[in-house]
Structures are given as C-alpha cells and as structure tokens.
C-alpha cells in the first residue's frame, strides 16, 4: 500500500508505492510498473485534486462496484488519515447508497465502523 512522505510542494504528502513490484514484479512487471509508477506515482500525486477529495472519490468508486475486500478497508483507513471524518464517511456512504445500492452501503458501513 502507499506510503506517505512529506514534500515541499504545496505541503501535500507524496505517495510512494512499492507493493506492485513487491507482489508482482517478477510475474507481471508491466502491471507492477503501472501500479507503482503511474497509478500511485503520478495519479495520486497530481495536485489538481487534494488527497482528501481523492480518497473520497476512491471509496465511492469501490463502493459503487461492490468491492468490499481489503482494498476498500485500506481506502477507508486512508480516507480517515487524510482528513475524512466519521460523519463525512457516513454522509457520503448514505448519499451514494441511493445511486449505487443499499446492500453496498451496508457492506461499507460494516468496514467503516472498524
């Protein structure tokens, strides 16, 4: 998972990812490169969207797809670390439930409460 390091640019944390290479470097080096260098190295470090907003978007995207595994749990924890409050998570999940589905919201709430 991404590790945060401070940078001087706009005081936003720099995301550094090595999990792709660690898990798949020998088996799928192109995928590992895209995961570590493009998704996290470039996309997550693009400062046009702040990390808090980016975390919210990611949680909503996973929720809307019905992905409730460890990746959603990690992204909920990441959202909390980047300033998304418990009340904001509850309001976001409630709002998205009307568009993505009630059962998906229940699954997210079960993870978010942990």
Regions found by a protein language model. Name each.
Residues 1-53, 73, 81, 105-114:
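Acidic, glycine/proline-rich low-complexity segments that act as flexible tails and inter-domain linkers
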Residues 38, 63-67, 82:
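Short alpha-helical scaffold segments that flank and stabilize functional sites
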Residues 54-62, 92-93:
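Short, structured motif recognition centered on aromatic/hydrophobic residues
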Residues 64-73, 102, 106:
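Short helix-capping/linker segments at secondary-structure and domain boundaries
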Residues 70-87:
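Mid-chain, well-packed structural core segment of small domains
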Residues 84-114:
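C-terminal binding/interaction regions
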């Amino acid at each position: 998972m991404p590790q945060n390091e401070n940078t001087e640019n706009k005081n936003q944390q720099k995301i550094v990812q090595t999990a792709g290479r660690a898990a798949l470097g020998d088996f799928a080096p192109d995928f590992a490169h895209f995961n570590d260098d493009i998704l996290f190295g470039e996309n997550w470090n693009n400062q046009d969207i702040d990390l808090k907003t980016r975390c919210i978007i990611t949680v909503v995207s996973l929720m809307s797809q019905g992905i409730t595994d460890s990746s959603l749990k990690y992204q909920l924890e990441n959202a909390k670390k980047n300033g998304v409050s418990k009340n904001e998570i509850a309001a976001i999940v409630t709002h998205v439930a009307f568009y993505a589905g009630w059962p998906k919201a229940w699954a997210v709430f079960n993870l978010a409460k942990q």
